């Protein structure tokens, strides 16, 4: 999910294009016949449908196309690595990498989250192999030394030079714009510089990978991330967040003070405490300081600033973005017990995102055939598929929690808009106007949102098929056979949502039959939608049969 200078000649130097600010009137224009290369499909009321037919299978098909492309469809570069291990972006025809700073921590964290949802959905174990490949590479080539004299030991770098085998932050002077009156540094963070919020994001990815695979190296990597974050948490204010946005890994010298992306870090600390890993008192202390700041500042003043690694350095937190706000809203919707005011906070975030990033810009309309299309950040206001899909997924979760029908409609139309960014090859572009291709925007931070949407609104999953859509745990094994679904979860207590092609007559957990019930251990089945909900206690293995 990079920001500036995406769309021009990926194989050559990329030139930044300043996006318009929200609130500017879009020029009148005729309805175009196509969106991102696909003919526009509308319903009888002129509202946007997906380009995929049949419509009811659109989101599952987009996921299949894009995952298949990622798993099988990219070349090996001159450095011996597949494109997605060394480049942020790629050419639309050759699929070879482009000359812009790589953002591995963001990409790999998103891929782990997406794979942990797509594996139970599909049963395709290749995505687990991909998780191992990207994480093993970054552990070996993108991690600070385990040297206690370093301020940030044993944690991931967020960025790298394009084509580099080793990630150490990018040499930012290589990516300064040649036509700037003075060089604007900071793109790719700078050599030796890391981003603490990505320590939290990829730390959470490592923890999820441990749950998926049982590999203790990933648990230990997550522990190192949590310890570094707890050690460096600080009081925040309107100009300084609990962790800086950019910091020199060896010395701890701060390069940029403010970053509001706390959702993944809060969840990492929550999970470390829940699982009894490491120092619970330290996790609680760090979490409390971060949470208090989040409530006092971004949740109150809407300064959701800084996330993207390829933006130049700014002296103050003026580059607002929807990513940090949207992921904070997701955290609250998935864990409402953490915040008594979750309804007010999430409603505020969703309204702010729609007003600030769903409005018209100089180049693009904010509402297209009834779909709210979301821009990325103040410094780059192009409408993008991944960010529109994030908005859709959070709206779907809000609908699930509140039964708000307008949120469901917004989610549906925005998801439909986002499908247009994926072509029949499974190549996903950033957006219809900003048409470059990124592994973050097209895969890591795109696919996971469709999975979240189908989990929140199960009737959006393909009918007449069998799919495990969501679990409160991590699903470590799944097996589909005609008239049967079997799965195993990491936690011995949890809830799952499935869409089935058959009416279940037998649901067992740990070999013990569950009873149909709306509350407590058991299951409920909606025959009109084919939706099964399982609630289990003291059991990891579930089998469903007709």
Name each model feature, range by range.
Residues 79-102, 149-193, 239-264, 302-329, ...:
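Carbohydrate-binding/catalytic loop surfaces
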Residues 488-505:
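Surface-exposed beta-strand/loop patches in extracellular or lumenal glycoproteins
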Residues 100, 106-121, 133, 203-208:
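Non-membrane alpha-helical segments in proteins
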Residues 189, 193-196, 200, 205-210, ...:
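Solenoidal tandem-repeat scaffolds enriched in leucines and small polar residues
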Residues 27-80, 133, 178-183, 187, ...:
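Terminal, non-catalytic domain-edge segments
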Residues 496, 521-546:
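C-terminal beta-strand-rich structural cap/linker in extracellular carbohydrate-active enzymes
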Residues 27-106, 125-185, 223, 228, ...:
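Low-complexity, Ser/Thr/Pro/Gly-enriched N-terminal "stalk/linker" regions
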Residues 8-19:
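Bacterial N-terminal signal peptides
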């Amino acid at each position: 999910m990079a920001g500036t200078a995406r769309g021009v000649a990926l194989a050559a130097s990329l030139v930044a294009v300043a996006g318009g600010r929200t609130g500017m009137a879009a020029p009148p224009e005729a309805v175009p016949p196509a969106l991102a290369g696909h003919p526009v499909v509308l319903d009888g009321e002129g509202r946007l449908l997906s380009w995929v037919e049949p419509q009811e299978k659109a989101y599952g098909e987009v996921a299949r196309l894009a995952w298949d492309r990622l798993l099988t469809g990219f070349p090996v570069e001159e450095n011996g690595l597949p494109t997605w291990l060394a480049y942020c972006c790629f050419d639309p025809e050759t699929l070879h990498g482009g000359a812009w700073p790589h953002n591995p921590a963001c990409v790999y964290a998103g891929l782990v989250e997406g794979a942990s949802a797509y594996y139970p959905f599909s049963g395709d174990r290749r995505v687990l192999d991909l998780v191992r490949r990207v994480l093993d590479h970054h552990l070996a080539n993108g991690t600070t030394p385990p040297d206690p004299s370093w301020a940030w030991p044993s944690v991931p770098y967020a960025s790298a030079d394009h084509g580099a085998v080793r990630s150490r932050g990018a040499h930012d002077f290589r990516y300064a714009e040649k036509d700037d009156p003075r060089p604007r540094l900071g793109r790719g963070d700078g050599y030796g510089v890391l981003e603490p919020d990505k320590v939290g994001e990829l730390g959470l990815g490592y923890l999820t990978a441990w749950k998926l695979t049982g590999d203790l190296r990933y648990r230990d990597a997550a522990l190192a991330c949590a310890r570094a974050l707890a050690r460096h948490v600080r009081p925040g204010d309107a100009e300084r967040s609990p962790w800086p946005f950019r910091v020199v890994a060896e010395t701890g010298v701060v390069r940029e003070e403010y970053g509001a992306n706390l959702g993944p870090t809060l969840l990492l600390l929550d999970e470390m405490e829940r699982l009894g890993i490491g120092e619970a008192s330290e996790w609680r202390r760090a979490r409390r300081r971060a949470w208090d700041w989040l409530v006092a500042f971004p949740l109150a003043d809407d300064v959701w600033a800084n996330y993207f690694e390829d933006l130049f350095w700014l002296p103050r937190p003026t580059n607002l973005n929807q990513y940090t706000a949207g992921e904070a809203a997701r955290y609250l919707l998935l864990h409402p017990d953490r915040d008594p005011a979750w309804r007010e906070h999430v409603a505020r975030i969703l309204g702010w995102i729609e007003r600030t990033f769903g409005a018209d810009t100089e180049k693009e309309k904010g509402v297209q055939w009834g779909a709210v299309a979301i821009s990325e950040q103040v410094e780059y206001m192009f409408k993008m598929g991944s960010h529109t899909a994030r908005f859709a997924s959070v709206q779907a979760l809000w609908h699930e929690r509140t039964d708000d029908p307008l949120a469901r409609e917004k989610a549906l139309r925005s998801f439909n808009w986002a499908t247009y960014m994926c072509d029949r090859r499974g190549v996903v572009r950033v957006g219809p106007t900003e048409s470059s291709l990124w592994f973050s925007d097209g895969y890591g931070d795109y696919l996971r949102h469709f999975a979240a949407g189908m989990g929140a609104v199960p009737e959006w999953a393909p009918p007449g098929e069998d799919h495990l859509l969501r679990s409160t745990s991590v699903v470590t094994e799944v097996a589909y056979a005609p008239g049967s679904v079997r799965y195993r979860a990491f936690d011995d207590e949890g809830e799952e949502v499935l869409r089935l092609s058959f009416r279940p007559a037998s649901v067992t957990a740990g070999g013990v039959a569950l009873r149909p019930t709306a509350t407590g251990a058991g299951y409920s089945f909606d025959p009109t939608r084919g939706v099964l909900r399982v609630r289990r206690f003291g059991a990891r293995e579930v089998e469903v049969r007709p």
